[in-house]
Design a protein with these regions (language model features):
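Cytochrome P450 C-terminal beta-domain/meander region
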Residues: 133-151
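Structural signature of FAD isoalloxazine-binding scaffolds in flavoprotein oxidoreductases
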Residues: 66-75, 133-137, 186-187, 216-217
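N-terminal glycine-rich flavin-associated loop
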Residues: 84-106
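A short, Trp-centered hydrophobic/proline-enriched beta-strand micro-motif
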Residues: 117-127, 168
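Short beta-strand-to-turn element immediately C-terminal to the catalytic PLP-Schiff-base lysine
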Residues: 101-103, 142, 168-172, 185-187, ...
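A short core secondary-structure module
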Residues: 151-196
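Flexible, small-/acidic-enriched active-site or ligand-binding loops
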Residues: 136-139, 156, 187-222
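Alpha-helical interface subdomain recognition
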Residues: 1-83, 102-107, 114-118, 143-148, ...
């Protein structure tokens, strides 16, 4: 485990910072927030075609760059810093991870290149209880020959109203807790899928409700073993937690930089407030908490690489994700 960026990782981070500083200004974010889709389609295509960020941690055999989660987190940190309005979290940190963790080779071959090209994908698992684990799954399925019939409602689906591809989590009728949970991947133009935008407090992040009514899916859509996907779903959610924590770490750095800059320009009692000891203490506390949180994120990213490659530290993923989540949420 390395405790400093490689030259390549530093270049990726610096390039992301420069690109997003130029393309995701405050004015651009406000414009994207009130647009129909909630993001700038031109910017999204530029991220796909020019920056190739959707492909960062996708293996080369599926058209990706074959890099790791540390590189992904380095980019996500800058996205959080500049409040990028784009379906990146849903497509890359959720749907792509779902395919990498639980997808068959055929599913990866079909859908990962589409995500790299700019198709929007997402994960739907939650209902009204808002829990962040496999027990939150309430949509049910039943077998009908070789097919599966899904019924129920999903809430808080990230970019669900814009998604071209969905990963659905559902539980077998009559099952409880983490038993009987399966994952399915399919396009969103099938009969039986209804979507509606969900008003959110955070307008930089679009969410939706999705209702599935007698949605018929065949065996080719099943990810992993039928009824045994709870462990996969929990792993996917841990990976998404680390990604969100990375965005928070970037946001923290921007808040600190803005605060320090303001303290240098605001004058009181004949001098700038940056010279006041109380302000210095506050800035130092902010920096310390931010560095601790960032360290937790990058440690978790290293563990995520282990988990995605079945390394010796893979079983520490949930703990590392929780530590990053706790530190970043408290500090931010």
């Amino acid at each position: 485990m390395d405790f400093a960026f490689t030259e390549e990782q530093q270049m990726i981070r610096d390039t992301a910072a420069a690109f997003l500083k130029a393309s995701s200004s405050s004015a651009a974010v406000r414009t994207a927030m009130v647009s129909d889709k909630g993001f700038d389609s031109g910017l999204w295509q530029s991220i796909c075609a020019d920056m190739y960020w959707q492909a960062l941690h996708i293996p080369e055999q599926y058209g990706g760059m074959g890099l790791g989660y540390v590189e992904l987190v380095a980019v996500l940190e800058q996205m959080g810093r500049y409040l990028l309005c784009a379906p990146y979290m849903s497509s890359v940190a959720m749907a792509t991870n779902a395919l990498l963790v639980a997808g068959t080779d055929a599913q990866k071959t079909l859908y990962l290149p589409q995500i790299i090209e700019g198709k929007i994908a997402s994960l739907a698992f939650n209902s009204a209880n808002r829990n962040w684990d496999a027990c939150a799954v309430s949509v049910t399925y039943r077998r009908d020959g070789n097919d599966f019939i899904l019924n129920g409602n999903y809430r808080y689906v990230l970019d669900g109203d814009n998604a071209d591809v969905m990963v659905f989590a559902a539980r077998e009728e009559g099952s409880v807790d983490e038993n009987g949970i399966s994952l399915f991947v399919c396009p969103t133009d099938l009969n039986g899928i209804e979507r509606a935008a969900l008003p959110t407090m955070d307008q930089t992040r679009r969410q939706a409700t999705i209702t599935v009514t007698n949605l018929r899916l065949d065996e080719s859509t099943v990810m992993g073993d039928v009824g045994k996907a709870a462990k996969h779903l929990n792993k996917i959610l841990d990976l998404a937690t680390i990604a969100l924590a990375a965005e928070q770490a970037g946001g923290m750095q921007e808040v600190l930089d803005m605060s320090v800059e303001y303290s240098k320009s605001r004058s009181q009692f004949g001098r700038t407030i940056a010279g006041f000891q109380a302000i210095k203490h506050k800035a130092a506390d902010m920096m310390l908490r931010g560095e601790v949180a960032r360290s937790a994120v990058y440690y978790a990213a290293c563990i995520a690489d282990e988990a995605l490659n079945d390394g010796p530290l893979a079983n520490e993923l949930s703990e590392a994700a929780s530590i990053a989540k706790s530190h970043c949420s408290e500090a931010y």
